[in-house]
């Protein structure tokens, strides 16, 4: 619905702005805001694993709603493979969810992408990949270029070639989140 001031949907726009703040926290773990939030809300985990908790401030609860947009609109770029969970994270070019799906015979054990590399090398271990995945996903994984210098894995914004976060595309991701019912009434009322 268009408003008279050119705003299409204020709730989606607000959610996109919260997503931008979450994106900044993800991209700059050395920032003062990241350090303060880590000390208070996720001292023993990573930002990606952070939960709301029972004593969440309005700010923290709002940022976690922005996280939902980032999770839908971002993918991982493989670097050293230490941060990406093979089964749970978005890292292969396979819409709609960009995730590897476990074949029935594979046990769902936590595994990071680095376990798919040759021992001591930045090359795919094709035997291990073929053992764990279906033909289509094996082909997609083997096409992913690997860093020769072992850079860290990086979260990139999927809608933009350079991987930079854009409010415009975050707005459309926020609309998807809201329309799917992922932003349920209980979350809105608690903010």
List where the protein language model places each region.
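A helix-boundary/hinge signal
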Residues: 1-191
